Amino acid sequence: VEKAAGRTVEETVEGAGGKTAGGSRLGTREIVLIGMFAAVLTVISQISLPMPTGVPITIQLFGIALVGAVLGWKMGFLATVVYILIGAVGLPVFSNFQGGFAVLAGMTGGYILGWPVMALLSGIRPTWKSKTLNLAVMILLALAGMMFVEFTGAVQWSRLAGDQSLSAIMAYSFVAFIPKDAVLTVLAVIVGTQIRRPLVRAGYLE
């Protein structure tokens, strides 16, 4: 998975002129980290509890927020996009070892398609003097990303379900998923911040 992810990032960067959104080139170190965390998402995605509704309870949003908090917004976004791309081409990286475009077009596909935005928001790091304030803002941004995922997922679910309205699905999500996802998101930002520090000191991240 890491090798496939690395190739995908290189192809994506070359197609965009060899640069990231911030204008800096991706080096081997960055590509390796992106591939590694795409692999981390693959592992986390297999942890799920099936539900009668067809939408499993997972800790995937923990993984998305973690990737953003550790890698930062650019690399976190790319790692999530790479994960989705390698799943879309058929590798079994989605939950329950599924793969293929059909997963993205299915009932839960809207949630997956919202993940890059959540990773991006989770990776924005304020640079104010107060570390507590910085962490609080990171958590709020990650929670905003989580709500974006819940909304995009509910939109696609409602369109495919036909007999369920968007408001009904969101109401159900507020009861069944959002409280759990919010706790996991907050935890992921805190844990991710701690993981990032030694990586920065070692020179793997800036």
Residue ranges: model-predicted function:
Residues L91-F97, Q156-A171:
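Interfacial helix-loop-helix junctions of multi-pass membrane proteins
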Residues L26-F37, I57-I64, G76, M107, ...:
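Residue-level signature of transmembrane alpha-helical entry/exit and packing/kink sites
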Residues V1-M36, A168-E206:
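Alpha-helical transmembrane segments and their cytosolic interface
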Residues E2-K3, E11-F77:
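Hydrophobic transmembrane alpha-helices
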Residues S45-S122:
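Alpha-helical membrane segments and adjacent membrane-interface helices in multi-pass membrane proteins
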Residues L41, S45, G87, M118, ...:
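Alpha-helical transmembrane segments of multipass membrane proteins
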Residues G18, V32-M36, V43, F101-V149:
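Short helix-perturbing small/polar motifs within transmembrane alpha-helices
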